[in-house]
């Protein structure tokens, strides 16, 4: 964390900087206003202030008082009921657990002090006994010494008689020594016995204290483990219990028990009737049947199995765990995350919170059924070689379809409108060396998504480049798609038979984009072909099969099929039609197919030539009928076992798609709200668009949306696959939209509505023309630009005074023509000093409309008299310029 200055800290805490500097100095930290303050210094200052103001001693006891007022309806006289207010007051005291711990620590310290005092008393008693025995021994020794001294003196006095008594003295000395030893032994034994008794007493006291402490610790732990036990409320609970018992006893004395001894609920009279406030109980209130509440606190924490989906809000999670949302918010704050009650949590976060709060978590996926349906497939793992899927890509008009046409020996290019491909064509071709499946993609810039789908579903990309045209934008885009898909690239240099063909230039240009020829040490095969003469076609097919052999392409042939939607359309007679490229398994007539947001039973199957077939294996393109709607191109098609489950999955996907779409629209509205308010009104060109196939519809919609500018916006209010219907015409009339049909026509009912409502209907078969005309229509909606053009310039040579007009400038026209009706500017030293209009234009006293270059004239400027010699009068006109996109 970055350090802050003293002045900034003072501003944050709401103090003056001088006072904060004083407090720092009192805390032993020297600071000025401009010095920075670290976190440690802040902490040191805080501790100093706490000590100074007594902040360390936090309150150990807190009392909460709660008052609630409710209304109770009671019956009065005459059968009428009246409402009375009941006020309930509650008082609850909370004591810090630390107080109880401190009391326990004090008791323990007291017991330890007692044990220590007992041990010290025992040691003192032992020392006293030993000192007493020692003193007695010393006294005996002194007495002995004294007796010996007296005996010696007596002996010296008596002389000879003393010698006779020597035997008696010796016997007396021995007896005295024996008695002294016995007395010392007795004193020592007594001291040992007293010390032993004191030690035994101290040990017994220590054992008793140990037992008492252990019992107190056990009781404390039991009380802590019990659910919802609170140290502060146990005393109050016991007091409340005693009070309740006393009240019950008092009421029991008034209302005697029945003969059976069964305790009646409080508020019930004998016989089970309610007290109605008669003569005997006039002053009694109507009590409820029982004062006992029906809920008891659980004795232990309740552990629940919490089911958590992919996302869950805080409120929903709290409801599942049966706790208040604030508890979850507190828990997440402890975990370092700030959330609100309506915030959406992901599955992992919700799992952590629930487990932290002691619950078991069961994770679920909303699309569990989808996973089950897709996983319920045949377990056949036997793989066999399959034909390669080859996508032909390249720039528009470089000869992709003509090349494929030569291979198929059919006229496809001439059948496409404008000679350009506008759909993905899927064909399979039998050659001498094996089968190859071709996907022909459009080259026009609008069909980016189509080309991307073609690269995704393919094994090999053949990049067609015209030898006379070289590398173009869609050629580069095709290279990028191939690299993104990790697909090997074969370059077919087409139109090699033309005189202006330059294959070396093509190689050089492609090498700049990372496509190197094998001749130049690269990995890409270059084949020179001609779609017109057939030159190099066999070499191209051999190269494709060789590349496929290197890739070792294999797939499961038997079992449930899976593939990808290449193209889809709505046929008037057959309904939704989808072209599917089978990637594994065998697709059979009658199979249940789940295809993106749609599902259905395969009613009929046709190959690319329109012939009916009953099954299709891997790498075979096939048209299927029977789906519930038109799937999007690029969707995965999967055969499933159960039609009911397929319907459920499709409906779930549709709901999810709708939710995402609505959320995106809402987000867009919120983001653009203020922009729309500030920018003002934006012109909108409303379009109702219908196309023959899904891919073309997608490409046209994308291209038209890209035409939108800040001033004119293309708004496609409705789009779809199939012919123009009466509903489309009504919608276009209501929203003032243009109806656009791409390779489709309006039916009879739609044509009537179009004529009666005067709706603008346009048909197109080439995407170029459609985009150009929409662009022109948008250009017509743009606000025009205005430009000022200078048409004449006159120099003031002299100034005359006119009584009617005022100052008249005698001028010479130096450039262009001075027109009387045009606005003018007066320039002085090339600076505009006035802008207005002419009041009079004369030549030789005659009023004229214009004066040409090189002639003299008199000019009167309306509402301006400060014309001076040397000024220039500039005449201009405003020209409107039509804008284009």
UniProtKB/Swiss-Prot annotation:
Subcellular location, record wording: Cytoplasm
Superkingdom field: Bacteria
Region (G3): 440-443
Residues covered by region (Disordered): 99-295
Residue sites binding GTP per the record: 394-401, 440-444, 494-497
GO cellular component entries: cytosol
G1: annotated span: 394-401
Residues covered by region (G2): 419-423
Molecular function terms from GO: GTP binding; GTPase activity; guanosine tetraphosphate binding; translation initiation factor activity
Positions of the UniProt region annotated as G5: 530-532
Stretch list, region G4: 494-497
Biased segments, Basic and acidic residues type: 99-178, 185-231, 238-250, 261-277
InterPro entries: DNA-bd_dom_put_sf, EF-G-like_DII, EFTu-like_2, IF2_assoc_dom_bac, IF2_II, IF2_N, P-loop_NTPase, Small_GTP-bd
Coiled-coil zones: none
Keyword Nucleotide-binding: yes
Composition-biased stretches (Basic residues): 251-260
SUPFAM superfamilies: Initiation factor IF2/eIF5b, domain 3, P-loop containing nucleoside triphosphate hydrolases, Putative DNA-binding domain, Translation proteins
Pfam assignment, any one: IF2_assoc
Domain tr-type G span(s) in chain numbering: 385-554
HAMAP family cross-referenced by the UniProt entry: IF_2_B (MF_00100_B)
Family to which the UniProt record says this protein belongs: Belongs to the TRAFAC class translation factor GTPase superfamily. Classic translation factor GTPase family. IF-2 subfamily.
General function of this protein: One of the essential components for the initiation of protein synthesis. Protects formylmethionyl-tRNA from spontaneous hydrolysis and promotes its binding to the 30S ribosomal subunits. Also involved in the hydrolysis of GTP during the formation of the 70S ribosomal complex.
Protein's recorded name: Translation initiation factor IF-2
Organism per entry: Shewanella loihica (strain ATCC BAA-1088 / PV-4)
Gene name as annotated: infB
């Amino acid at each position: 964390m970055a350090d802050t200055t003293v002045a900034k800290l003072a501003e944050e805490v709401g103090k003056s900087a001088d006072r904060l500097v004083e407090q720092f100095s009192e805390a032993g930290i020297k600071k000025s206003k401009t010095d920075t303050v670290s976190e440690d210094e802040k902490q040191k200052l805080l501790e100093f202030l706490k000590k100074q103001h007594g902040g360390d001693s936090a309150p150990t006891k807190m009392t909460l008082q709660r008052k609630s007022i409710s209304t109770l309806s009671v019956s009065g006289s005459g059968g009428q009921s009246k409402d009375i207010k009941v006020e309930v007051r509650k008082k609850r005291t909370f004591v810090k657990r630390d107080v109880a711990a401190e009391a326990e620590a004090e008791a323990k310290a007291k017991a330890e002090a007692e044990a220590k005092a007992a041990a010290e008393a025992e040691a003192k008693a032992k020392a006293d006994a030993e000192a007493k025995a020692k003193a007695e021994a010393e006294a005996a020794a002194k007495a002995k010494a004294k007796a010996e001294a007296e005996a010696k003196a007596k002996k010296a006095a008596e002389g000879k008689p003393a010698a006779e008594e020597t035997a008696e003295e010796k016997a007396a000395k021995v007896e005295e020594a024996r008695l002294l030893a016995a007395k010392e032994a007795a004193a020592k034994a007594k001291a040992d016995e007293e010390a032993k008794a004191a030690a035994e007493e101290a040990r017994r006291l220590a054992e008793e204290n140990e037992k008492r402490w252990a019992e107190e610790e056990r009781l404390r732990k039991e009380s802590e483990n019990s659910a919802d036990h609170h140290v502060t409320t146990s005393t109050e609970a016991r007091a409340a219990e005693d009070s309740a018992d006393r009240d019950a006893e008092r009421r029991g004395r008034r209302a005697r028990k029945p003969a059976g001894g069964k305790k009646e609920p409080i508020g019930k009279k004998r016989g089970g009737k309610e007290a109605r406030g008669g003569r005997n109980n006039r002053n009694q209130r109507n009590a409820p049947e029982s004062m006992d509440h029906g809920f008891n606190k659980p004795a232990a924490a309740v552990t629940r199995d919490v089911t958590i989906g992919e996302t869950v809000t805080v409120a929903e999670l709290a409801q599942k765990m049966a706790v208040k949302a604030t508890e979850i918010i507190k828990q997440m704050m402890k975990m370092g995350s700030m959330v609100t009650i309506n915030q959406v949590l992901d599955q992992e976060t919700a799992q952590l919170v629930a487990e932290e709060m002691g619950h078991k978590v069961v994770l679920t996926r909303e699309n569990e059924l989808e996973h089950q349906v897709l996983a319920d497939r045949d377990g056949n793992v036997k793989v066999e070689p399959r034909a390669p899927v080859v996508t032909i890509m390249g720039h528009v008009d470089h000869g992709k379809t003509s090349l494929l046409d030569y291979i198929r020996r059919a006229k496809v290019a001439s059948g496409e409108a404008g000679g350009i491909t506008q759909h993905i064509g899927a064909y399979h071709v039998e050659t001498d060396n094996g089968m190859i499946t071709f996907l022909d993609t459009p080259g026009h810039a609008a069909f980016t998504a189509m080309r991307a789908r073609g690269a995704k579903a393919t094994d090999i990309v053949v990049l067609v480049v015209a030898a006379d045209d070289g590398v173009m934008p869609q050629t580069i885009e095709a290279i990028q798609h191939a690299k993104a898909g990790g697909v090997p690239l074969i370059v077919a240099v087409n139109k090699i038979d033309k005189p202006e063909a330059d294959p070396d230039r093509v190689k050089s240009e492609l090498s700049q984009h990372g496509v190197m020829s094998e001749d130049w040490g690269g990995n890409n095969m270059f084949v020179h072909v001609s779609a017109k003469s057939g030159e190099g076609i066999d070499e191209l097919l051999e190269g494709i099969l060789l590349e496929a052999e290197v890739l070792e392409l294999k797939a499961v042939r038997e079992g449930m099929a899976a593939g990808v939607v290449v193209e889809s359309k709505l046929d008037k007679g057959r309904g939704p039609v989808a072209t599917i490229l089978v990637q594994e398994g065998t697709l059979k007539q009658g199979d249940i197919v789940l295809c993106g947001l749609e599902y259905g039973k395969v009613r009929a199957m046709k190959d690319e030539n329109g012939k009916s077939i009953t099954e299709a294996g891997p790498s075979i393109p096939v048209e299927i009928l029977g789906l519930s709607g038109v799937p999007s191109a690029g969707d995965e098609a999967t055969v499933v076992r159960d039609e009911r489950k397929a319907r459920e999955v499709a409906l779930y996907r549709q709901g999810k798609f709708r939710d995402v779409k609505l959320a995106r629209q809402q987000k867009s509205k919120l983001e653009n709200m203020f922009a729309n308010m500030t920018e003002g009104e934006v012109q909108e060109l409303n379009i109702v668009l219908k196309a023959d196939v899904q891919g073309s519809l997608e490409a046209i919609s994308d291209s038209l949306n890209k035409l939108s500018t800040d001033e004119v916006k293309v708004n496609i209010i409705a789009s779809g696959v199939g012919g123009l219907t009466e509903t489309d015409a009504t919608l276009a009339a209501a929203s003032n939209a243009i109806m656009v049909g791409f390779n489709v026509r309006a039916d009879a009912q739609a044509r009537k509505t179009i004529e009666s409502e005067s709706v603008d209907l346009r048909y197109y078969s080439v995407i170029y023309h459609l985009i150009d005309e929409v662009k022109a229509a948008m250009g017509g909606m743009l606000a025009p630009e205005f430009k000022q053009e200078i048409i004449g310039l006159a120099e003031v040579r002299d100034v005359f005074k006119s009584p009617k007009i005022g100052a008249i400038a005698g001028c010479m026209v130096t450039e262009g023509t001075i027109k009387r009706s045009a606005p003018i500017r007066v320039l002085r030293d090339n600076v505009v000093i006035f802008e207005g209009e002419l009041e009079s234009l004369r030549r030789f006293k005659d009023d004229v409309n214009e004066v040409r270059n090189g002639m003299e004239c008199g000019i009167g400027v309306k509402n301006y008299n400060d014309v001076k010699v040397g000024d220039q009068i500039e005449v201009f006109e405003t020209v409107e310029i039509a804008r284009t996109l």
